[in-house]
Swiss-Prot record:
Name of this protein: Segregation and condensation protein B
Record keywords, A-Z: Cell cycle, Cell division, Chromosome partition, Cytoplasm
Single GO cellular component term: cytoplasm
GO BP of this protein: cell division; chromosome separation; DNA replication
Quaternary structure and interacting proteins, as annotated: Homodimer. Homodimerization may be required to stabilize the binding of ScpA to the Smc head domains. Component of a cohesin-like complex composed of ScpA, ScpB and the Smc homodimer, in which ScpA and ScpB bind to the head domain of Smc. The presence of the three proteins is required for the association of the complex with DNA.
PANTHER family documented for this protein: SEGREGATION AND CONDENSATION PROTEIN B
Primary location group: cytoplasm
Family membership: Belongs to the ScpB family.
Pfam families xrefs: SMC_ScpB
Subcellular localization(s) per the UniProt record: Cytoplasm
Gene3D superfamilies per record: Winged helix-like DNA-binding domain superfamily/Winged helix DNA-binding domain (1.10.10.10)
Biological role: Participates in chromosomal partition during cell division. May act via the formation of a condensin-like complex containing Smc and ScpA that pull DNA away from mid-cell into both cell halves.
Length: 192
């Protein structure tokens, strides 16, 4: 690979790493190139983003590099967040919503444990759509935030109370459960 190709891959890795970011050392290991080369490419990318009229920038904090939006464009990002949503919710968001609905109040760590993957983004999506809300903190180490469904959740799904949620099945056949879940998600994808 030449330097421009490495630059493109590093840019993609910065994007893919999201909020967690990535260290130069990690990039060096992933790309199997020297740390000096990675740092040089990061500096070039940073310069290009700063020099050109671009919407993104590379920030570094605690030796972790992040791809971020430029603060001077924040009013446009706020408009996007505040605009009515017509997009569909992801399956991850729907799964997370179901877990919260049936297990509330619940912490994000508990949601992660049930799903087997991190749920930070689905939780944020549900908060943004006002389907869930923070309801306090759990009385345990670290005092994590507890989440519950909101009044908008009840309204959106046409429920008077949480007691109107359909009961969870007791004897679960995993194959049948997956087929039914797929049908459920297909039905609500059109509505959400």
């Amino acid at each position: 690979m030449n330097m421009n190709e490495f630059k493109g891959v590093i840019e993609g890795l910065l994007f893919a790493s999201g909020d967690e970011g990535v260290t130069a050392k990690q990039l060096s290991k992933i790309l199997d190139i020297g740390l000096d080369t990675v740092e040089h490419i990061l500096e070039e990318l940073r310069f290009e983003y700063e020099r050109e009229d671009r919407g993104l920038m590379i920030i570094q904090s605690n030796n972790i590099f992040h791809l971020a939006t430029k603060p001077e464009h924040s009013s446009y990002f706020k408009r996007l967040i505040d605009s009515p949503r017509t997009s569909k919710m992801s399956q991850a968001a729907l799964e997370t919503l179901a877990i919260i609905a049936y297990r509330q109040p619940i912490t994000r760590a508990e949601i992660d444990e049930i799903r087997g993957v991190r749920s930070e983004r689905p939780v944020q999506t549900l908060i943004t759509r006002n389907l869930i809300e923070e309801t306090g903190r759990k009385d345990t180490v670290g005092r994590p935030v507890l989440f519950q469904t909101s009044k908008e959740f009840l309204t959106f799904f046409g429920l008077a109370t949480l007691d109107d949620l359909p009961p969870l099945p007791e004897n679960i056949d995993p194959d049948k459960e997956e087929r039914e879940a797929d049908l459920f998600f297909e039905r609500f994808q059109d509505e959400v």
